[in-house]
Amino acid sequence: MAVSARDYWDLTKPKVVALIVFTALVGMFLAIPDMPTWLQVRTGALGFLGIWLAASAAAAINQLLDAKIDAQMARTSWRPLVVGKVRPWQVLVFAGVLIVISMTILVVWVNVITAVLTFASLIGYAVIYTVYLKRATSQNIVIGGLAGATPPMLGWAAVTGLPTSADWINASLLVLIIFIWTPPHFWALAIFRRADYAKAAIPMLPVTHGVPHTRKQILVYTVLLAIVTLAPVAVGMSGMFYLGGAAVLNAVFLWYAWRMLNPPDELFSMKMFGYSIVYLMALFAFLMVDHLLLPWVR
């Protein structure tokens, strides 16, 4: 049976990758203090493409290495490799082609530092997290979350090359936001899917330490997140428009985290999971709008 374009598309986890590359795009915009030059637009577009292809390759490799686990979980049992729509060698070739194209674009037309950081992130997620951390520790998503948090830095690097310490610091603050956001985001899902994780012998926190402990950890990380999101204002990267938007988003996220301690029903954790996605997209949208369209409110 021939492999369809949709099957290859599904291998890339398009919804997950869309959020990843959006934060990379915001990193690009924040890195440029004024209107971008034509060269910056061209470099940014190529950087965006390279980062997107690398993230897609990482997603495909993750599905290749996790096929046995995915087959045991209701949430992932439909994936193309699990149901036999694609063969493992086809996934490997597909991912390899994406990596080669991505690295060629980044090295030749963007810059080496972006290529190196992007490749390191790919290895961090597709290999270190998927092969080792996911199966080894209940802190898998905390430690492994660093690889998934780097896209804003990758975007920043694409248009600047990270030439100064200020560039590294500002880009790192954006990475820190996603890094702290990842545990409450993923643990909310893990609470709802804990039976699947237990069946697949994946030591997610709700499986190893119980749901009440996980709910408390979600609250702790959500409080930390609310604090960390003040950093762009503290360093002068963003202004009052972003601060106001972040305050509203954080208030709702904190309410969800507090309510999670005694949720009204089993589905509440999925509601928090859904909001966490909206939260991150909106937070980075506020960063971008504040930077591009509302300089007068700073």
UniProtKB/Swiss-Prot annotation:
GO terms for molecular function: protoheme IX farnesyltransferase activity. Keywords: Cell inner membrane, Cell membrane, Heme biosynthesis, Membrane, Transferase, Transmembrane, Transmembrane helix. InterPro entries: Protohaem_IX_farnesylTrfase, UbiA_prenyltransferase, UbiA_prenylTrfase_CS, UbiA_sf. Its EC number is 2.5.1.141. It is a multi-pass membrane protein. Pathway: Porphyrin-containing compound metabolism; heme O biosynthesis; heme O from protoheme: step 1/1. GO terms for cellular component: plasma membrane. It is found in: Cell inner membrane. GO terms for biological process: heme O biosynthetic process. The keyword Membrane applies. The keyword Mitochondrion does not apply. Converts heme B (protoheme IX) to heme O by substitution of the vinyl group on carbon 2 of heme B porphyrin ring with a hydroxyethyl farnesyl side group. This is Protoheme IX farnesyltransferase. It comes from Xanthomonas axonopodis pv. citri (strain 306).
